[in-house]
Amino acid sequence: MGLVVLAADKGAPGVTTAAVALAAVWPRPVLLAECDQAGGDLVYRLPAEGGGMLNPARGVLSLAATARRGLRADQVWEHTQRLVGGLDVLVGLTNAEQAQGLTWLWSPLGRAFAGLPGADVVADCGRLGAGSAVTDLLREASTILLFTRPTLEHVAHLRERIGSLAAELGGHAAPPIGIVVVADPREYRASITEVGRIISHAKLPATVLGGFALDPKGAEMLSGRGAWQAQWGGRLDRSLLIRSARQIAGGLAARATSGPGADRDAQGVASGPQPR
């Protein structure tokens, strides 16, 4: 189906929290994938189904061993785990040292995500850098979402990142780049409008899609420290974080079947199992 990539420039403001929130409210079956080259956080943030700890060895690391012999999209499901609350996840690498030996993986993994049977993929790619190997995964996306704070330094870094990323991706078939502003609820609309004005004035190939509320209490509940399973449908479901995630998710899900990777199956894809 479709691949939606979440990333940021310097500081990666709330990308993992946003990825979990978006996946949790996604209107179709979805897989949350940790693709941060610096290492993932889900193992430390959220409990597995049944209340135990997620297995850090089952995920991108175990999938890499499979991919050395060729990777079919349906094989991704063999390396996923399920969070308490029912969300399927592909746990990321544990540190940057592991990523250094797996730079070849991102291209076949991106193709597999784009052709994944039965679900969209929300991929947390963390902080992007110039010449990053994970750019090969981004090429397969339906949409790339870049998160920013509405401060001078964050928006300045964002402008530079959009320009360099567009140059790296190149071509008319490059995925569209959307911007999400992580903003204080008290200045929410004004912050989104101002970032949109700056991006438009700079004539950058990106569009501000909306905002994510800066909601520390909602983020704490979503992290597992606030008993996620017990509070889902209650305070967490009504939090500013989840409400803003729903606004973004609806529009993104419609885009997720129309991007560059959505029309291209991974080589050798076989009809595989539906999400568990």
Predicted regions and their residues:
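Walker A/P-loop NTP-binding active-site region of P-loop NTPases
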Residues: 3-71, 120, 124-125
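C-terminal boundary of histidine-terminating zinc-finger modules
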Residues: 220-249
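Cytosolic-facing regulatory segments adjacent to core modules
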Residues: 79, 89-126, 130
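Beta-strand-loop-alpha "switch" segments that mediate conformational coupling across diverse proteins
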Residues: 183-231
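Well-ordered beta-strand positions
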Residues: 143, 178, 208-210
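Inter-motif core of Ras-like GTPase G domains
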Residues: 116-117, 131-152
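Conserved C-terminal guanine-recognition region of P-loop GTPase G domains, centered on the G4
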Residues: 158-171
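Conserved beta-strand segments of the P-loop GTPase G domain that flank and frequently precede/overlap
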Residues: 5-7, 33-34, 91-93, 122-125, ...
